[in-house]
Amino acid sequence: MTRKTRRLWIVIACLACVGSAAALTLRAFSSNIVFFMAPSQVKANPPSPDRTIRLGGMVMAGSLHRINENGTPVNAFEVTDGQAAVEVHYTGILPDLFREGQSVVALGTVQKDGGFTASEVLAKHDETYMPKEVADELKRTGKWDPRFGKAPDASSWDTMTAKKAGG
């Protein structure tokens, strides 16, 4: 075996090792990736029930109510992006800053009936905060254009959404 051939085999072996390591790393990370989806995306293309996602949008005014499922108190509310709404069921104490008309991100799974069961609910932390994913989705769907000022406040945004949903 010549020196050139030996060097070529060493390079090929190194590339194979690096490629294998990269493939194993990506495979390990892919099972931990949690995708962000807006309600309109969930309605149009529901993920499989075993897939955990982050659902983001605004809590519709008047949608928060407490129900009883199998003897357990559950918070039920609707999350909307202005185009569609998804009902969310969450067993647990809602964050102190959770309000109707405010942005929220819920971590959980979409059920076969189209509802969403959340294992965690995150609310905004002050009056100017909006999760980046929610702001990006509002911009993408045309609900908010930064050229025309800041994002709509919760009450006017929710009023716009209620008119669209009702009419």
From Swiss-Prot:
> Where is this gene product found?
Cell inner membrane
Q: Which domain of life is it from?
A: Bacteria
Taxonomic lineage is: Bacteria, Pseudomonadati, Pseudomonadota, Alphaproteobacteria, Acetobacterales
Q: Which GO terms describe its molecular function?
A: heme binding; metal ion binding
- Family of the protein in this entry: Belongs to the CcmE/CycJ family.
- List residues in topological domain: Periplasmic: 29-167
Start and end residues of each stretch annotated as Disordered? 141-167
Per UniProt, where does heme bind? Answer: H125, Y129
Q: Which residues lie on this side of the membrane: Cytoplasmic?
A: 1-7
GO BP terms = cytochrome complex assembly
Q: Which Pfam families match?
A: CcmE
The UniProt regions of compositional bias labelled Basic and acidic residues, in chain numbering, are: 141-150
Role noted for this protein: Heme chaperone required for the biogenesis of c-type cytochromes. Transiently binds heme delivered by CcmC and transfers the heme to apo-cytochromes in a process facilitated by CcmF and CcmH.
Q: What are the transmembrane regions? A: 8-28
Which residues constitute the signal peptide according to the record?
none
Q: How does it sit in the membrane?
A: Single-pass type II membrane protein
Q: Which UniProt keywords apply?
A: Cell inner membrane, Cell membrane, Cytochrome c-type biogenesis, Heme, Iron, Membrane, Metal-binding, Signal-anchor, Transmembrane, Transmembrane helix
List the protein's name: Cytochrome c-type biogenesis protein CcmE
Please give the PANTHER family that the UniProt record associates with this protein: CYTOCHROME C-TYPE BIOGENESIS PROTEIN CCME HOMOLOG, MITOCHONDRIAL
Give me the Gene Ontology terms describing cellular component: plasma membrane
